[in-house]
Swiss-Prot record:
Name of the protein this chain belongs to: Eukaryotic translation initiation factor 3 subunit K
The organism's place on the tree of life at top rank: Eukaryota
GO-annotated cellular components: eukaryotic 43S preinitiation complex; eukaryotic 48S preinitiation complex; eukaryotic translation initiation factor 3 complex
Job description of the protein: Component of the eukaryotic translation initiation factor 3 (eIF-3) complex, which is involved in protein synthesis of a specialized repertoire of mRNAs and, together with other initiation factors, stimulates binding of mRNA and methionyl-tRNAi to the 40S ribosome. The eIF-3 complex specifically targets and initiates translation of a subset of mRNAs involved in cell proliferation.
Compartment list: Cytoplasm
């Protein structure tokens, strides 16, 4: 069985004690969770369970909500795609922050807190692009507006973490991919930077003799291995006999 997506090996003991006790519902613990979010941003870790607990506290105590902390949680969730972390966090936010307000009241509330709502919706846009594997468009969108840069500024190594996640998804799908395409998907502006990332970070190989130009070769793994699969089912004679009898039975 795989490791749960919300499991965090680096979770401090005091945070674990709060999460496993009644204090997780105590509004006074919001400051502890908020400091923990700052720590996650600095040391490149992500604790989904703790972050969801903080967002739940915000849901019960709206006056305690800190927009910057929320956007940092969402930005961190982007670095662990394609896990459900981002959508789970988004679901705990006020209804008027959602990309598509359902009622006029929600739309009016959105206009009253437009900066926070705009930030949430921009991050939701980035999540959609990542989840739909539109990697080149993700980078172009991220680089298109200074607000995006501000939203991810507190997350140390944001771009590097996202590149690694994209590379993981590429490794599940491809055995070979042209360097030109991968360069766009990883937003690496030079061939030298791409080659360094591919070899040192991914441990993949480069074939510069291919007719189509430089090709990146991904080692075989259980996800990208092409294999035929034959499925069969065995039907016992008793089961088959019951089917035949039922076909001759007259309706009562």
């Amino acid at each position: 069985m795989g490791v749960a997506f919300d499991k965090c090996e680096t979770r401090p003991a005091n945070i674990d004690a709060i999460l496993n006790g009644l204090d997780r519902y105590n509004p006074e613990t919001t400051t502890v969770f908020q400091d923990y979010v700052v720590q996650q941003c600095e040391d490149r870790t992500f604790d989904c369970y703790a972050n969801l607990a903080l967002l739940k506290l915000y849901q019960f105590n709206p006056h305690l909500l800190q927009p910057e902390t929320v956007t940092n949680i969402l930005a961190k969730a982007l670095t662990v795609f394609p896990s459900p972390a981002f959508s789970l966090c988004l679901a705990l936010l006020p209804a008027h922050t959602q990309p598509f307000p359902a009622t006029n009241d929600e739309a009016q509330a959105a206009s009253q807190t437009s900066d926070f709502v705009e930030s949430v919706q921009k991050l939701a846009r980035l999540s959609t692009l990542l989840e739909s594997a539109q990697y080149a468009q993700f980078w172009s969108t991220l680089n298109s507006d200074d607000l995006y840069a501000d939203l991810v500024a507190d997350v140390a190594g944001f771009e590097e973490l996202v590149r690694i996640r994209i590379a993981v998804e590429v490794g599940k799908t491809f055995r070979e991919i042209t360097a030109d395409v991968l360069e766009q998907w990883l937003d690496l502006r030079s061939r030298e930077a791409l080659e360094k990332f591919v070899v040192e970070v991914c441990s993949w190989e480069l074939d510069k003799s291919a007719p189509a130009g430089t090709v990146v070769k991904v080692p075989t793994n259980k996800e990208n291995e092409a294999r035929s699969e034959v499925k069969s089912e065995r039907v016992g004679i008793e089961q088959f006999g019951r089917v035949l009898r039922r076909g001759f039975e007259q309706a009562a």
